[in-house]
Protein backbone atom coordinates (compact mmCIF):
# COMPACT_ATOMS: atom_id res chain seq x y z
CA UNK A 1 0.00 0.00 0.00
CA UNK A 2 2.95 2.36 -0.08
CA UNK A 3 4.21 4.53 2.75
CA UNK A 4 0.99 6.38 3.56
CA UNK A 5 -1.97 5.57 5.72
CA UNK A 6 -3.35 2.04 5.69
CA UNK A 7 -5.89 1.76 2.90
CA UNK A 8 -4.72 4.88 1.02
CA UNK A 9 -4.01 4.64 -2.67
CA UNK A 10 -0.35 4.49 -3.75
CA UNK A 11 -0.69 7.93 -5.38
CA UNK A 12 -2.05 9.45 -2.17
CA UNK A 13 0.68 7.76 -0.17
CA UNK A 14 3.40 9.17 -2.44
CA UNK A 15 2.05 12.71 -1.90
CA UNK A 16 1.93 12.40 1.89
CA UNK A 17 4.41 14.35 4.07
CA UNK A 18 5.66 11.03 5.43
CA UNK A 19 6.73 9.91 1.94
CA UNK A 20 8.70 13.13 1.39
CA UNK A 21 10.68 12.53 4.59
CA UNK A 22 11.29 8.86 3.93
CA UNK A 23 14.83 9.07 2.61
CA UNK A 24 17.99 9.21 4.69
CA UNK A 25 21.54 9.76 3.55
CA UNK A 26 24.16 7.44 5.01
CA UNK A 27 27.93 7.52 4.52
CA UNK A 28 30.08 4.52 5.37
CA UNK A 29 33.08 2.59 4.11
CA UNK A 30 32.38 -0.68 2.31
CA UNK A 31 35.29 -2.99 1.57
CA UNK A 32 37.67 -0.05 1.89
CA UNK A 33 35.73 2.30 -0.41
CA UNK A 34 33.65 5.30 0.68
CA UNK A 35 29.93 4.97 0.00
CA UNK A 36 27.10 7.48 0.17
CA UNK A 37 23.56 6.21 -0.27
CA UNK A 38 20.12 7.74 -0.05
CA UNK A 39 17.83 5.07 1.34
CA UNK A 40 14.46 4.44 2.87
CA UNK A 41 15.17 4.51 6.64
CA UNK A 42 13.68 1.01 6.87
CA UNK A 43 16.15 -0.47 4.34
CA UNK A 44 18.36 -3.18 5.76
CA UNK A 45 22.07 -3.42 5.14
CA UNK A 46 21.40 -6.68 3.28
CA UNK A 47 19.02 -4.98 0.86
CA UNK A 48 21.40 -2.04 0.40
CA UNK A 49 24.26 -4.41 -0.44
CA UNK A 50 22.29 -6.60 -2.82
CA UNK A 51 19.84 -4.17 -4.44
CA UNK A 52 21.59 -0.80 -4.37
CA UNK A 53 25.26 -1.77 -4.53
CA UNK A 54 24.80 -4.99 -6.54
CA UNK A 55 27.03 -7.03 -4.22
CA UNK A 56 25.24 -10.36 -4.21
CA UNK A 57 27.76 -12.43 -2.27
CA UNK A 58 25.88 -11.73 0.96
CA UNK A 59 22.89 -14.07 0.94
CA UNK A 60 19.30 -13.63 2.08
CA UNK A 61 18.47 -16.85 3.90
CA UNK A 62 15.75 -16.48 6.51
CA UNK A 63 15.45 -12.65 6.63
CA UNK A 64 14.96 -13.03 10.41
CA UNK A 65 18.48 -13.19 11.81
CA UNK A 66 18.34 -16.92 12.46
CA UNK A 67 20.55 -18.52 9.80
CA UNK A 68 23.66 -16.33 9.43
CA UNK A 69 23.72 -16.46 5.61
CA UNK A 70 23.69 -12.65 5.59
CA UNK A 71 26.64 -12.23 7.99
CA UNK A 72 28.91 -9.26 7.28
CA UNK A 73 31.41 -7.41 9.45
CA UNK A 74 30.63 -3.94 10.79
CA UNK A 75 33.62 -2.32 12.47
CA UNK A 76 35.15 -5.80 12.69
CA UNK A 77 32.18 -7.41 14.44
CA UNK A 78 29.84 -9.86 12.76
CA UNK A 79 26.26 -8.75 12.27
CA UNK A 80 23.20 -10.17 10.58
CA UNK A 81 22.77 -7.71 7.74
CA UNK A 82 19.11 -8.69 7.38
CA UNK A 83 18.43 -7.16 10.83
CA UNK A 84 20.75 -4.15 10.59
CA UNK A 85 19.20 -0.94 9.33
CA UNK A 86 21.48 0.65 6.76
CA UNK A 87 20.71 4.08 8.24
CA UNK A 88 22.57 3.09 11.43
CA UNK A 89 25.87 2.70 9.57
CA UNK A 90 26.86 6.37 9.45
CA UNK A 91 30.67 6.43 9.62
CA UNK A 92 30.96 2.64 10.00
CA UNK A 93 33.34 0.28 8.27
CA UNK A 94 31.56 -2.62 6.56
CA UNK A 95 33.14 -5.70 5.02
CA UNK A 96 31.18 -8.04 2.79
CA UNK A 97 32.52 -11.27 1.33
CA UNK A 98 33.56 -9.34 -1.79
CA UNK A 99 36.00 -7.29 0.30
CA UNK A 100 37.79 -10.20 1.95
CA UNK A 101 40.21 -10.92 -0.88
CA UNK A 102 40.74 -9.15 -4.17
CA UNK A 103 43.28 -10.94 -6.34
CA UNK A 104 43.57 -14.33 -4.65
CA UNK A 105 41.78 -16.33 -1.99
CA UNK A 106 42.30 -15.35 1.63
CA UNK A 107 43.74 -18.08 3.89
CA UNK A 108 40.23 -18.62 5.31
CA UNK A 109 38.68 -19.01 1.85
CA UNK A 110 41.51 -21.37 0.88
CA UNK A 111 40.90 -23.47 4.02
CA UNK A 112 37.17 -23.71 3.24
CA UNK A 113 37.99 -24.81 -0.31
CA UNK A 114 40.67 -27.29 0.78
CA UNK A 115 38.39 -28.87 3.40
CA UNK A 116 35.24 -28.94 1.22
CA UNK A 117 33.53 -26.86 3.90
CA UNK A 118 30.42 -26.38 1.78
CA UNK A 119 28.04 -28.30 -0.40
CA UNK A 120 25.57 -25.99 -2.09
CA UNK A 121 27.65 -22.95 -1.01
CA UNK A 122 24.71 -20.71 -0.12
CA UNK A 123 25.79 -20.26 3.51
CA UNK A 124 29.51 -20.08 2.73
CA UNK A 125 29.96 -16.27 2.53
CA UNK A 126 28.38 -15.86 5.97
CA UNK A 127 30.34 -18.81 7.36
CA UNK A 128 33.61 -17.33 6.09
CA UNK A 129 32.96 -13.86 7.53
CA UNK A 130 31.97 -15.44 10.85
CA UNK A 131 35.29 -17.27 10.75
CA UNK A 132 37.11 -13.96 10.19
CA UNK A 133 35.42 -12.51 13.29
CA UNK A 134 35.95 -15.73 15.29
CA UNK A 135 39.70 -15.69 14.63
CA UNK A 136 39.91 -12.03 15.66
CA UNK A 137 37.91 -12.68 18.85
CA UNK A 138 40.11 -15.67 19.73
CA UNK A 139 43.29 -13.66 19.08
CA UNK A 140 42.04 -10.96 21.47
CA UNK A 141 41.15 -13.58 24.11
CA UNK A 142 37.39 -12.97 23.99
CA UNK A 143 35.73 -15.93 25.77
CA UNK A 144 32.70 -17.82 24.46
CA UNK A 145 29.90 -19.59 26.33
CA UNK A 146 32.01 -22.77 26.47
CA UNK A 147 35.39 -21.27 27.36
CA UNK A 148 36.73 -23.39 30.23
CA UNK A 149 39.26 -20.94 31.70
CA UNK A 150 37.80 -17.44 31.92
CA UNK A 151 40.94 -16.18 33.68
CA UNK A 152 43.29 -17.20 30.89
CA UNK A 153 45.31 -14.33 29.47
CA UNK A 154 46.13 -14.07 25.80
CA UNK A 155 44.57 -15.77 22.80
CA UNK A 156 41.71 -18.21 23.33
CA UNK A 157 42.36 -21.89 22.66
CA UNK A 158 40.27 -22.95 19.67
CA UNK A 159 39.12 -26.46 20.44
CA UNK A 160 36.51 -28.05 18.21
CA UNK A 161 33.93 -27.28 20.92
CA UNK A 162 34.99 -23.61 20.93
CA UNK A 163 34.78 -23.44 17.14
CA UNK A 164 31.32 -25.02 17.08
CA UNK A 165 30.08 -22.58 19.74
CA UNK A 166 31.58 -19.53 18.05
CA UNK A 167 30.15 -20.57 14.65
CA UNK A 168 26.73 -21.49 16.06
CA UNK A 169 25.08 -18.39 14.59
CA UNK A 170 25.56 -19.81 11.11
CA UNK A 171 23.41 -22.65 9.83
CA UNK A 172 24.48 -24.98 7.03
CA UNK A 173 21.37 -26.63 5.66
CA UNK A 174 23.52 -29.19 3.82
CA UNK A 175 25.19 -30.31 7.05
CA UNK A 176 28.84 -29.60 6.21
CA UNK A 177 29.62 -28.81 9.86
CA UNK A 178 32.48 -31.30 10.33
CA UNK A 179 34.30 -29.81 7.34
CA UNK A 180 33.51 -26.24 8.44
CA UNK A 181 35.08 -26.90 11.86
CA UNK A 182 38.12 -28.44 10.13
CA UNK A 183 38.44 -25.39 7.84
CA UNK A 184 38.25 -22.99 10.78
CA UNK A 185 40.85 -25.07 12.64
CA UNK A 186 43.15 -24.95 9.59
CA UNK A 187 42.64 -21.19 9.18
CA UNK A 188 43.46 -20.67 12.87
CA UNK A 189 46.82 -22.39 12.45
CA UNK A 190 48.55 -24.67 14.93
CA UNK A 191 47.02 -24.84 18.43
CA UNK A 192 48.56 -22.50 20.96
CA UNK A 193 49.91 -23.92 24.17
CA UNK A 194 49.44 -22.17 27.50
Predicted features along the sequence, with ranges:
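Signature of N-terminal electron-transfer/Fe-S-associated modules in redox systems
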Residues: 1-194
Amino acid sequence: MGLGTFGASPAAAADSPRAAASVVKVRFTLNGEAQELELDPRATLLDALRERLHLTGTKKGCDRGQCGACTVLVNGRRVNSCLTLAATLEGAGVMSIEGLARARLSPIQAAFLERDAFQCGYCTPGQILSCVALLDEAKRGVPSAVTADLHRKGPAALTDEEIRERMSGNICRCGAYVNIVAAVRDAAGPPRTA
